[in-house]
Amino acid sequence: MSYTFGNQDFQLRLSERNGAIKSITFHGTELAAPSTGMFTLRMYLHETGDYRFFQAEEFPKFRREGELLLWSGHPEAPEFTVGCRITFDGEFFRFRPSLRHVPGEMWADLIEMPQLCVPLEKEIFWPHGPGCLIREPWKSFREYHHAGFPGNSDPCVYPGSASVQFLAAYGSRYGLYYAADDPTHSIKTMEIGPAAGSSVRLRIECTCDRQGMEQEFELPFDLVVGAFEGDWMDACEIYRRWMKHDPIMKRDFALPDWMEESPVVIIYPVCGDGRITPEPNRFLPYERNFTRLKELSAALDSPLLVLLMRWDHNGPWMPPYYWPPVGGEESFLTFCDKLHKAGHRIGLYGSGTLYTRKSRIHDYSTEEEYRKRGLERFMARGPKGEVDARICSNIRQGTELCITEPWCVDVMCEQVKLVAEHGVDFFQILDQNHGGESFVCYARDHHHPPLPGVWQTRAMAKLIETMRRTAAATGNPLLIGCENVAAAPYVAQMPFNDRRNPLVYGQEANAVQYLFHEYANNFLGNESSAWETIRCADSPDNLQLRLAMSFVRGEYLSFTLRDSGEIDWGAAADWSAPAPEQQPVLTLAKQCNAFRRKYRKFLLHGTMQKPSVRLECGWYELKLRKRDSEFLPLVPTGAFRAPDGEEAQFLVNFRNRPEPVRLRSDRPFTLETGESRTQFPAGESALELPPLSCGVLLFSHEKED
């Protein structure tokens, strides 16, 4: 027997025995797999600092009171009652969790409700970084991660390493959409995990903030389950309709003019090689590489944004103190002056909201300052009051800054001010805060509740805004950026970031560019995981493939360099291994960036949309080190709608050979490739793309009066 919600087309069935989801059907198609329970709670024992997990199966008494489901009778806390109000609004099933009679020694820390499972064979969209379609072994065996202390890259936390607050699972026609309808963008874990019967659990764990300290608590927003026809892009359209009215997407400052010229981002370290070490390399003094940069600019026919890694005076990745640059301020400023006079830009990496107490790779230490100034009182604390930091702990020993504490904000802004005053155009100071992630803090004497929650999102948004205003006050309004794509509530404030490829987990499904391209154009990034993920020698065109995919997503192009001046596979590649073949990469990038500048109304200012022209082409086998190969189209494509309503679809042949492709279109179009323009009628067409080339399909458009 079951409780049924919904209508004839879209139906939810719950177990009468324990309230678990048994079935979700859409137009007669089953979208879900049976779940064993409805919820998981993580309670915080505030006297001891321990966690206590509760599963729905531990509450033997279950009943329904109209729209409200209630669980109670736990043997350790008989009065403790968990509730969920379920409604159907014609489009979504809405779940509103609540707690009553919470035991006095506990605070509500995390709530996962409902527990939603899907069959293993479904394609699963996971919002890790830009978004990905998760693959094995992660799909079947991913561990159950939770937001917590200290911060690390394992759990997918929103807003942060999770860029949006929805997941999706779909088959050949229909799919399931699972999201938090939370306009405050509070902290959540956006995860998956193995479930019973060859199924996967789509997991949204919500934090409780100050309200979690009460004995009665209701989550202030709904979790929603909807259905769609199509794939991950159609799921994105649901989220886009919700997000476009969010006032957080409004930007209150002008973007710098140099973004209009689409500089190619050239990334390299001035210390170490593919490994992080403190020894200077051949990129120092800074001016030494200027001749090579001039050559690259000429070969690409483009201005450059030179983005330096491991430049900080105290050694690579030793926050929060960076200035002056390693190699000397005089050399650095001379280099900046040369770049600016040649029409280029300069950017720097930072290392986020972290504090280094001691380096593990050389003799740098701040232990004396830390002790004498009593800085520990400003640091983020764990559930037992401990201080720690796990991120980059192989490089440094340290702690995390609590960004509600004025001293921590001041030290971040002080570094931004120094960098801005010296003419830098872009500062990725939130590297290691993936997507702008703010770290959990349980301190009871800081300027926030002693539980994770929406205060973290608000504090990070305020920090980003304060850093930006600090830079603007110097007369140099440099851009602030983060590692990976900026998560949704920070997109407007950080429109230019170092996108990271989620290839280690699955095939990229770039929801961030799809949803937010008109607000933010990220760049391909330093691709630090490429070498450890891709068998580069066995997939020699893989860098060209990555450039092509970046271009059709509307991103700025970027390369990393070795100190030989060669373009590399990525920032962490082995410099003793052969570099990529150079000329094909440069030829392709020049073609793509010329198109990017010519069609900036699409590729810089446009809204990404689902391609209307269907392409049939061959497949490229991308050979990977730790999982099965990915097979990706030999002709990547992406479609955009310009602000004036005109539409275009871009395509790329990234290999050094002609590539046949068949196009199916419901309307006529004009194909432009280089200097060639050819008109095609609606229907099916066959053509051959030249080697290392890009093209655009243009559709007739009547402008509105």
Task: Write out the residue ranges for each language-model feature.
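The substrate-binding groove and active-site-proximal loops of carbohydrate-active enzymes
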Residues: 264-287, 314-329, 393-411, 445-459, ...
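Active-site neighborhood of glycoside hydrolase catalytic domains
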Residues: 400-493, 507
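Carbohydrate-recognition beta-sandwich/jelly-roll modules
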Residues: 4-305, 338, 342-345, 426, ...
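Short, acidic/polar
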Residues: 281-296, 408-420, 543
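Active-site-adjacent "subsite" loops/lids of carbohydrate-active enzymes
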Residues: 331, 337, 345-419, 504-519
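Acidic/aromatic-lined carbohydrate-recognition and catalytic surfaces
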Residues: 306-380, 459-482
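C-terminal beta-strand-rich structural cap/linker in extracellular carbohydrate-active enzymes
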Residues: 681-705
